[in-house]
Amino acid sequence: MKRILVSLYEKEKYLDILRELHEKGWEIWASSGTAKFLKSNGIEANDVSTITGFENLLGGLVKTLHPEIFAGILGPEPRWDVVFVDLYPPPDIDIGGVALLRAAAKNWKKVKPAFDMETLKLAIEIDDEETRKYLAGMTFAFTSVYDSIRANQFVEGISLAFKREDLQLRYGENPHEKAFVYGKPAFEILHEGKTISFNNILDAENAWFMAKNLPRMGAVVVKHQSPCGAAIGEDKVEIVKKAIEADDESSFGGILAVNFEMDEEVAKSLKKYLEVIVAPSFTQEAIEVLSKKKVRLLKPGDYASWAGKMAFGSLVLSERKYPEGNFELVVGEPLSEKELEDLEFAYRVVEGAKSNAVLIAKDGVTVGIGSGQPSRKRAAWIATVMAGEKAKGAVAASDAFFPFPDSLEILAQAGVKAVVAPLGSIRDEEVIEKARELGITFYKAPSRVFRH
């Protein structure tokens, strides 16, 4: 006869599968509360209090922490074949349940641990060494994540633990490299034209971060972790059209993120090949239109934004958020309300560009983006070359201070009328004086916005 020890928080959730086990002849043992629940639903269950001699202590805080219980899990001839525990969710802290799971995982050759529906079904249905090792490994990973979450309730950021997810990635950054996902991604794939890749996820997250932080309704197109076009406005179709056409060549095969619901009209207007489309919501009609294409549709959820890299074998994390504070006029004529919106728009998009970056915008559209340059002067030059005649009367944003006045000279020569950039260079006064000399309005940004 097979025997299982269970202790459940969400008792209703597992009622059917435990009834099925009972009907198949399994002997069910349970903590007092779970045993009473099962019996009330017509499932025979043995109460572990018949082993320990008490139902619970301290008002239910101690139920299964007893030498006889753990001897029945850890011994050479264990009392149970499977130990299944559904732990208390945050912010509660489960002590006995975690201990039961760890004990079962330690004695994996004799006892199979399970902590959710998936692992429970595996423990019940398959009995071979590979499955036992898998269940033990998954259990230790699960309890590690559980403890990590509780640690952060006391000291923020003290611990991180992620379980490898089943989400399959097409490949890594390059086709010859493998890739894995650790931690459940905060997005829902509504349609997957082909398997999502490592690069798709990174590009989509950057595109969404910029799109959701635009000053009003807008769209951003990302390619290779940098924006190649963005637009804001009032008409959804026009916004998307302008964002794509801002760099028509580079947007091919890019990632589009919008901060409004993707509807049928916008979906039908999309003629350019895109790898991923990210939106806070999609109408069913839009999904039907876009599902005919080899495009992934992502609906993001809520999550804290972090930027991270593996370096020297360590995971290095940084918060990602826009700086608080307003632009401060340093020199020149104040901009109109519309021009100031363009300036804010440019600053919020340049945040997502690879540093060094300079971005030129006009009438709610990016017209030139110079990014990923070791030299800020070169970034400014690339932005003006891309903008061409559209730079005249436009505004520009720099993701960090101007170390020399030369970048301003390049922007002024192209016709840019105003810039926003943080200060902090030893040549700030020289740069400000050059802006005054060139007739460029200079606004101070609250902080630099590097992106590596």
UniProtKB/Swiss-Prot annotation:
Its EC number is 2.1.2.3, 3.5.4.10. It comes from the Bacteria. Signal peptide: none annotated. Pfam families: AICARFT_IMPCHas, MGS. SUPFAM superfamilies: Cytidine deaminase-like (SSF53927), Methylglyoxal synthase-like (SSF52335). InterPro entries: AICAR_Tfase_dup_dom_sf, Cytidine_deaminase-like, MGS-like_dom, MGS-like_dom_sf, PurH-like. One of its GO terms (cellular component) is cytosol. Residues 1-115 form the MGS-like domain. PROSITE patterns: MGS. The keyword Hydrolase applies. Pathway: Purine metabolism; IMP biosynthesis via de novo pathway; 5-formamido-1-(5-phospho-D-ribosyl)imidazole-4-carboxamide from 5-amino-1-(5-phospho-D-ribosyl)imidazole-4-carboxamide (10-formyl THF route): step 1/1; Purine metabolism; IMP biosynthesis via de novo pathway; IMP from 5-formamido-1-(5-phospho-D-ribosyl)imidazole-4-carboxamide: step 1/1. The keyword Cytoplasm does not apply. GO terms for molecular function: IMP cyclohydrolase activity; phosphoribosylaminoimidazolecarboxamide formyltransferase activity. GO terms for biological process: 'de novo' IMP biosynthetic process. The IMP cyclohydrolase activity resides in the N-terminal region. Belongs to the PurH family. This is Bifunctional purine biosynthesis protein PurH. It comes from Thermotoga maritima (strain ATCC 43589 / DSM 3109 / JCM 10099 / NBRC 100826 / MSB8). The gene is purH.
